[in-house]
Structures are given as C-alpha cells and as structure tokens.
Design a protein with these regions (language model features):
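Alpha-solenoid helical repeat scaffolds
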Residues: 21, 56, 87-90, 125-129, ...
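TPR/TPR-like (Sel1-like) alpha-helical repeat modules
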Residues: 60-61, 74-98, 158, 162-171, ...
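Alpha-helical adaptor scaffolds
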Residues: 4-11, 21-24, 32, 36-40, ...
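Conserved structural position within tetratricopeptide repeats
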Residues: 25, 57-60, 94, 129-133, ...
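Structural motif corresponding to the intra-repeat A-B loop/turn of tetratricopeptide repeats
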Residues: 10-11, 45, 79, 117-118, ...
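TPR/Sel1-like alpha-solenoid repeat signature
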Residues: 42, 148, 210-217, 229, ...
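Generic helix N-cap/helix-start motif at coil->alpha-helix transitions
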Residues: 1-2, 27-36, 48-50, 62-70, ...
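Single-residue signature of alpha-solenoid repeat helices
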Residues: 16, 51, 85, 123-124, ...
C-alpha cells in the first residue's frame, strides 16, 4: 500500500494500479486502505460512481474510521447533501477528528442549504427546529427573514425582524421587513411604522433605518413623514434608493422640479461610479 500511495501522489496511475491489483487478491478485510485510496482518487477526479462504490466497500469493513468519514463528508458536500454533511461532520467532531472551525464551516453551509430547500411554512418550521439558536440569531438571521418574505409568509417575516433587529441591527433585515409590511393590513402597517420609529429613537443617526422608514411612510401615503425620513437619511448617507423614493414622494405631492432634482442626483452618482474622476497629475 505504501507503494500505491506514493505512486498516487506522483500521479503515476499505471504504477498505482499495478500495486493495487496485487493487493486485490488479499482477503476483503485487508483491503480497506485500497478502497480508501481508490475513493479519494475518484473524488479528486469527480468520478463519483467509482468513489461511491469504494466508500461503500470501505464502510463494510470499518464504518467508524475517521479517514473514511472524512471522504464520506467530502462526497456528501460535493453532492449538496446537507443532511449527510451534518451527520458526518457531527461524527468527526465526536471522534475529535475535525477542529471546531472546520466543523462550523460545514454546519453553516449545511443549514444554509437546508434553508434554501424550504418550500412552504411546514418545511420552514421543521428546518428552523434543526438550526441552532446561535445561527438563527447570527449568520442565518437575514437569510431566514428573506426566506419568509419570498415564501409569502409576510406576518412571519415581520415577526422575525421584530424579534431580532433590536439585538443585531443588521440593515439587511429591514429590507425583508419593508417588503413584507406592505402586504399586511393598514393597521398592521401602521404598527410596523411605529415599531421602526421606536428603533429610531435608540439610533437616530441610522441612515438605512431612516431610509426604510421613509419607504414605509411612502407606502402608507404619509408624504410629509416620508419626506422627513428620506431627507434625514440622505443628509447622513446619500443613497440611490433614498433619492429615488424621495423623487416619488415629490411626484405624489406635485413637486415635479424637486422630483427631477432627486433623479438627476441619482444619474450623477451612477455616472461618477462608472467614470470616476481622473487623478490629478502633478505638474
């Protein structure tokens, strides 16, 4: 096997296969290393049928071997099998064969994958039960809010943001919040504006929050409030979104000149991004 390993490392597959052919005549229980080497080589070539065949044969000999489980993890990851990735990563953690950082990376990927496969309220509920609280309130917090909104679970999306935004203050949560609020009743929309306004009291210089409040007020046709929020947002941090919504506010209040001014500012900012000013050359 040492010769086969060395030949494989040198990518001398003819020599490797000659060594492996000799080992092939040994009893099945003595062929574990052969199956592992063939599986690893097949995975590197993305020859998944051969990899699966050898992984299965190796598992019949010793299913708990850490090297085998690592290869199974790699196979599951390549196939996008989130449930199997979680199972194999957990097995390696228990065996002390994988460090915390690597395990966390695999777990984060797997939970994101599971979340992406959710198609309705029932499967979302089942998925959320599997995800650790630390991830739900951390790295996956925004993705969960966005998933609720995309599934049309607007009340759930608003409830999620209400529960998590005060702690995380992730501006990305606000987009899912605003997009979902507009599908709720007028009473619920007003409650959402009041809620977001209460967040603003704690962080009055939060430009994204001001912009999204402006969008909420625009949706409720509260033109004066919308203008105030948007102008405050632009004063702190100009953005294309804030300028465009403010232009629509001016359209609704019969101020076409001011509306055009906002759109001109957008065009100027886009032009600057596409054609930044040339650096001044020294004389």
């Amino acid at each position: 096997m040492l010769g086969a390993h060395a030949a494989d490392q040198m990518e001398n597959f003819e020599l490797r296969d000659r060594y492996l052919h000799e080992i092939e005549h040994l009893p099945q229980k003595q062929q574990l290393s052969r199956h592992l080497l063939l599986a690893e080589s097949a995975l590197s070539r993305r020859d998944y049928p051969t990899a699966a065949q050898n992984l299965e044969a190796a598992a019949k000999i010793n299913s708990n071997l850490s090297r085998l489980v690592r290869l199974q993890l790699r196979y599951a990851f390549d196939h996008g099998d989130a449930a199997d990735v979680l199972a194999k990563a957990e097995k390696l953690v228990k065996a002390g064969a994988i460090n915390d950082y690597e395990a966390e990376q695999y777990q984060n990927w797997a939970y994101r994958r599971l979340l992406s496969e959710v198609t309705d309220a029932g499967s979302l509920k089942a998925c959320l039960k599997r995800i650790p609280e630390s991830l739900k309130s951390g790295e996956l917090c925004v993705a969960i809010a966005e998933k609720c909104e995309r599934l049309g679970l607007y009340a759930e999306a608003v409830k999620w943001v209400k529960a998590h935004y005060p702690q995380t203050r992730q501006p990305e949560l606000l987009e899912a919040f605003v997009e979902s609020v507009r599908f709720l009743s007028e009473r619920e929309q007003q409650k959402a504006i009041d809620l977001a306004d209460s967040w603003l009291q704690e962080q009055p210089d939060n430009a994204p929050l001001l912009m999204y409040l402006g969008q909420l007020a625009y949706g409720r046709k509260l033109w004066g409030k919308a203008q105030g929020y948007l102008e405050a947002s632009i004063a702190l941090q100009p953005s294309v979104s804030a300028h465009l919504v403010l232009a629509r506010v001016f359209d609704e209040t019969d101020q076409p000149q001011k509306a055009q001014e906002q759109r001109n500012l957008v065009l100027e900012s886009v032009a600057e991004e596409e054609h930044p000013a040339a650096l001044t050359q020294p004389n």
